Amino acid sequence: MLTERQLLILQTIIDDFIGSAQPVGSRTLAKKDEITFSSATIRNEMADLEELGFIEKTHSSSGRVPSEKGYRFYVDHLLAPQNLPNDEIVQIKDLFAERIFEAEKIAQQSAQILSELTNYTAIVLGPKLSTNKLKNVQIVPLDRQTAVAIIVTDTGHVQSKTITVPESVDLSDLEKMVNILNEKLSGVPMSELHNKIFKEIVTVLRGYVHNYDSAIKILDGTFQVPLSEKIYFGGKANMLSQPEFHDIQKVRSLLTMIDNEAEFYDILRHKQVGIQVKIGRENSATAMEDCSLISATYSIGEEQLGTIAILGPTRMQYSRVISLLQLFTRQITDGLKK
């Protein structure tokens, strides 16, 4: 549809605008090394690109800026992968180098690091715990009255909580109970644990622990964990540093949406596998109509576990963000396989 010359001019306009946030005129383009056409030719091609809807005028400048259609064409047809700096690759890989892979900790740190590397808002939707399977459970005494119950799932999710240990339960009973739980419950989906414990495990415990009723109370406290996905944000206020959002009235609804968090559950929960780019009004939420959302899913085999997303202005560094998300999802997937 577009000529080679138009493709080059469109890509140069978008690349320049992404970097400068300033409308791009023919004089700016004429100074670019890769543009060898006359100013008159550049103006004619820009007029054609505007007529086709790929670029548009602003009220305050004679230059042009990319339209949503222009950004979509750029992402679909002109984008080239960006090679990330080695120090950033090392920083990201170091995050996933720990031998014990705690999914919750990784999700929190991923959101923070991505927000720092991009200066956009990063969102990580963790796995839905109800679809996880129990890997093992530990109960670690802190003193005579309290202990920490630690639940580890097959996806690396670690859930810990402090529980009360009745005086009537001795440490040997606690150890027996943990051994029985790991023997009988390893591999059981988290959503089925409650039924399995109170229909099967309690019967087994009767023959092994002295104070049966107190042991049941410990069990009940240990496995009361939220099963829905957790969502983590990094750089919630980063949008305010973008020139497009210096008008607080313009960005107020977006900041409210980010602060409330809940709307992003529905947005991220149903993402298709792989990298997805939503630009401007392609986003379902009206508060995001001046934003782009780039998301990537991570999984083990056929099982999709979670989503990482970057929210920024439509003038986003698409190539860099996509390269970062691809690296993060590879690292998370590899970490979950450990």
UniProtKB/Swiss-Prot annotation:
Keywords: Repressor, Stress response, Transcription, Transcription regulation. One of its GO terms (molecular function) is DNA binding. SUPFAM superfamilies: GAF domain-like, Winged helix' DNA-binding domain. InterPro entries: GAF-like_dom_sf (IPR029016), HrcA (IPR002571), HrcA_C (IPR021153), WH-like_DNA-bd_sf (IPR036388), WH_DNA-bd_sf (IPR036390), WHTH_transcript_rep_HrcA_IDD (IPR023120). It holds the Pfam family HrcA. One of its GO terms (biological process) is negative regulation of DNA-templated transcription. It comes from the Bacteria. Coiled coil: none annotated. NCBIfam families: hrcA (TIGR00331). Negative regulator of class I heat shock genes (grpE-dnaK-dnaJ and groELS operons). Prevents heat-shock induction of these operons. Belongs to the HrcA family. HAMAP family: HrcA (MF_00081). This is Heat-inducible transcription repressor HrcA.
